Amino acid sequence: MKMHSRIFTILVLVAITLTTSLFIACGEDNTDPTPVTPPQEEPEKKPGDKQDEEEEDETEMSDTNYNISSIVFPIHRNAGLSETITIYPDENNLFTERVYSVRYDHTRPYMMPASLSKLYIEFNSDAKTIYIDGVEYKKNTPYDFSKPVTVTACADTGTEKSYTIELKNFTGLPIIYINTASGQEVKDKENYEDATIEIIGSESLPGLAKMDMQIHGRGNVSWTAFTKKQSYTISLSSKQKVLGMPKHKKWVLISNYRDKTLLRNNVAWWISSHMPGIKYTPRFQHAELILNGRHRGVYQVVEQVRIDNDRVDINEMKPTDTEGEAITGGYLIELDRMSDDTDQWRWVLPYLQGGSHQANIKKPKIDESNQAQHDYIKDYLFKVDKLLGTSEDMEYVMETYIDMPSWAAQWLVFELSGTPEPNGPSSWYTFKDKNDDKWYCGPPWDFDYQSFVPSTANQFRNKKYVYQPQMRKYQPYREELVRQWEAVQPLLPDLINYINEQREYMRHSAEANWFIHEQNLKDDESHQNGDEYIPSDMAIDRMIEYLYLKWDYVENNIRNLK
């Protein structure tokens, strides 16, 4: 009997220790000055003792009153919300929800992010005490939910249960706030307007502190035809990393106005980045744009095509580079049917698609101050254009003046995306470097137009354009096309996985974007892509269908392309 008594005494001491520790975890003070009376031996209790059963029932009841059945962010206490938000925990005791507000402009709704830094919260719980990140909860105190917080609910017995509250800011993508100095819409495509920018980062992408910048409109057809959601060029006051991309001042905000998938550029640039012949593919991220206080939808934040060590990595010329080796490069050249043909610094190339397209020198800036650079690059381009159009010695032309891997790879990126852009290029980028006679292609740009359409998959849509018929006269160039294709041909499963990952990552953003622009897209009469009237998910499935068809067609036909 003494042995039983000792065991009982030890068990009681352990129970007291555990209970005390639970009270400490729930914020109770265990510094009671009253001495603890040593436990006394109690008579052995018989099974079925009524008093014992009542005590057990009471303990069971008190140990369940720390559950939190739901949390509430009431609209009457949170001015930034458009409705009361009630959230229930999942099996892992996680409360998670995406928080935003809905506003109206001329009766048309649009979504806006709600501030998560000062929200009033209420709990549906019988817990005796609740702690938020270790501090006792008070109903009339706002809390910061911009980051995950830990909530601890304590029962009368001191038993506790922990939960996590993880609110998603708006769609989960970074949020760009731009405010122009005038407070008006950006209407000028040529001249910059002063503005400020601030970027609120996401879980995986860093933000940017508020700073000065300038903004103007950009695009050709996209600027004039799609006025409800336009694209912009921005210039920061100093070089900065933006959403994890290398430092620079110049960035582009692409609206992807007519792209129901919101992924056409993503997919084309994924293909480009896996082409060994492409020296540079623009980096990008997606973000929500709040311009002058209004949500404009999801935008693609892209590196502007510039001469830079992290972009088009060629020599950057100075105005004084006017002779010898210095004048040979580097030049960033855009083949552009949209250029102003009255501009004396742009020239029609007679053998580029029958003389219907121009060469537009993007860098260096060509004007009266550097006439020598103008004359050099004009003479070079006219010489290569004529040789491609008239020479009988294609070996000499191709081996001397054409970088075959980059021309083959860029043409193939456009062909795999199915866009007819090479037929009338408005953004076909090329370049020539210093001390290098060869003409290079890249980077690929502009894939939101008539691309990834299943009905166009069973053909080479662009085989007649951007010098391709002339270049294919040379057998090694045809072999280069096959080499570039064989580098990406096995990667189709990886590409499909990437598309589905992006589909999920962009899901809430797509919902918010088309909440604003669905009707605008339907009202656009061009309907270039053929998916304007179907949901985003179906449009993405349609894109995947196209890729399977196109991959099969190219694999079966590229080795016979003449």
Where are these regions (language model features)?
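Bacterial N-terminal signal peptides that target proteins for export
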Residues: M1-V12
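C-terminal motif of bacterial Sec signal peptides marking the signal peptidase cleavage site
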Residues: L22-A25
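Beta-rich interaction/scaffold domains
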Residues: G27-L173
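Short, well-structured beta-strand/strand-turn elements
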Residues: A127-Y131, H274-E288, T419
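Conserved NTP-binding catalytic cores of kinases and kinase-like/nucleotidyltransferase enzymes
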Residues: L167-L263, V267
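Structural recognition of the beta-strand scaffold that forms the well-ordered cores
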Residues: Y177, S231-S235, M245, K250-S255, ...
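Middle-to-C-terminal accessory/interaction subdomains
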Residues: W223, T227, Q358-G424, W428, ...
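Internal "kinase-insert"/substrate-recognition segments embedded within catalytic cores
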Residues: S235-K241, H248, S255-Y257, G277-Y280, ...
